[in-house]
Amino acid sequence: QNWAKFKEKHIRSTSSIDCNTIMDKAIYIVGGKCKERNTFIISSEDNVKAICSGVSPDRKELSTTSFKLNTCIRDSITPRPCPYHPSPDNNKICVKCEKQLPVHFVGIGKC
């Protein structure tokens, strides 16, 4: 995965996320099945990129500040469209950095 895909999958400028609509997009369908969960970072691209600024070599990095988050969690295994519910949070995030850019969302709160 690269920075462009990471942005598309995880960064949003607004916290008003309709999980049921957004999670039915092709990028969240894995092997023909609905993805179990996806975390959205409510922030500017520059703030998220800053996590990897100066990080060398490529590695996982924990943000020094907390981000507003919204995780869409699948309620049940059903045919598409799958039902999801939002789980808001405010926490540090761990991302995988490559060439000083976030390319993979690792987790919330720790690496």
Swiss-Prot record:
It catalyses: an [RNA] containing cytidine + H2O = an [RNA]-3'-cytidine-3'-phosphate + a 5'-hydroxy-ribonucleotide-3'-[RNA]; an [RNA] containing uridine + H2O = an [RNA]-3'-uridine-3'-phosphate + a 5'-hydroxy-ribonucleotide-3'-[RNA]. GO terms for molecular function: lyase activity; nucleic acid binding; ribonuclease A activity. SUPFAM superfamilies: RNase A-like (SSF54076). Substrate binds at residues 5, 35-39, 60. The keyword Secreted applies. It comes from the Eukaryota. The keyword Nucleotide-binding does not apply. Disulfide bonds join 19-72, 34-82, 52-97, 94-111. This is Ribonuclease, liver. The lineage of its organism: Eukaryota, Metazoa, Chordata, Craniata, Vertebrata.
